[in-house]
Curated annotation (Swiss-Prot):
Protein name: Geranylfarnesyl diphosphate synthase
A molecular-function term among this protein's GO annotations: geranylfarnesyl diphosphate synthase activity
Chain residues that bind Mg(2+) 2: D72, D76
Site (The 8th amino acid upstream of the first aspartate-rich motif (FARM) is an important determinant in controlling the chain elongation of C25 FGPP synthase): A64
């Protein structure tokens, strides 16, 4: 993908170990959902020229996403992502932290460099502001996610607020920045941001589902990771708070055995939490689709591809 080449060229820096750590997860693969949303939004609203201008902006979104993954993996002590050992497992915590910091800075440098790709000063400023806001929201979301591991005083509203920040904010930014690249006005930018936010919430709910029933060989991540960390996913909250299956409280967390986690997963499925989560994911995808239908398109094919991407979000198996 063109975005990958851009990032790899950009991050071809010395020392080699820093470059290697920074690009470890990029080279491992991934969905590239966020930069794809940026590029499709730019083309939908401004045609092929806008899409070409958006390449460094789309790369900045993926670079920021990769930075957040590296740091999240350190905090969660996750050992596998995208089917390979995580960055801190391969390079150690110190190098992984440094790689994340470097990617974070690189994401904003890419936006500055977008001026050389035909972006105006105002467009670059708007994109910079959007990503800056998203970066703060992501950190807030991660903070809530960590705090929720320490308590059971978490309800669906708390969960949704956390997800809007941790996952929704960057996908919202991806869509808004695509609109900025196309030269769209503030109202269209806002509407595309709402498309991205709702898609992001659905994406995270689907992630929660795959954390319970996903195949590790397909997802590239160990199953039950969220349960092992004691994370308050939508499924866990529903099973405990809505279905009254409080035995889950004693079956998840860092001290839980593999049998405990399997039993917790079985209880979650039996409680109806899986069906509930799937229905909520579809609700947010349909909300995104409704908003998207009201956005005028210069390129109809790109709009259709965005609609297909919404389908993928709730149907994906990894």
């Amino acid at each position: 993908m063109l975005i990958d080449h851009y990032i790899m060229d950009f991050m071809s820096i010395t020392p080699d170990r820093l470059s290697g750590a920074s690009l470890h997860l990029i080279k491992a693969g991934g969905k590239r959902l966020r930069p794809l949303i940026t590029l499709l939004t730019a083309r939908m609203l401004g045609g092929l020229e806008a899409e070409a201008r958006a390449i460094p902006l789309a790369a900045s979104i993926e670079t920021a996403h990769t930075f957040s993954l590296i740091h999240d993996d350190i905090m969660d002590r996750d050992e596998v992502r995208r089917g390979v050992p995580t960055t801190h497992v391969v390079y150690g915590d110190d190098w992984a932290i440094l790689a994340g910091d470097t990617l974070h800075a690189a994401a904003f440098k890419m936006i500055a460099d977008s001026r050389e790709w035909g972006m105006s000063h105002e467009q670059a400023y708007r994109a910079f502001k959007v990503l800056s806001e998203a970066a703060i929201q992501i950190s807030r979301g991660q903070a809530y996610d960590m705090l929720f591991e320490e308590t059971w005083d978490v309800d669906v509203a708390d969960y949704l607020n956390m997800v809007r920040l941790k996952t929704g904010a960057l996908i919202e930014a991806a869509a808004r920045i695509g609109a900025v690249a196309a030269g769209a006005g503030s109202e269209i930018e806002k509407m595309m941001g709402e498309v991205g936010m709702n898609a992001g919430i659905a994406f995270q709910i689907r992630d929660d589902i795959l954390g319970v029933i996903g195949d590790p060989k397909v997802t590239g991540k160990p199953v039950y990771n969220d349960l092992r960390r004691g994370k308050k996913t939508l499924l866990v909250i529903y099973a405990v708070k809505k279905a009254g299956r409080r035995e889950i409280v004693d079956l998840i967390g860092p001290k839980a055995s593999e049998d405990d986690l399997k039993r917790a997963a079985s209880i979650i499925v039996d409680s109806g939490a899986l069906d509930y989560a799937e229905s909520r994911a579809r609700f947010y995808v349909e909300r995104a689709r409704d908003i998207l239908s009201r956005v005028p398109a210069v390129d109809a094919e790109s709009k259709e591809l965005l609609n297909l991407l919404l389908d993928y979000i709730v149907e994906r198996v990894k």
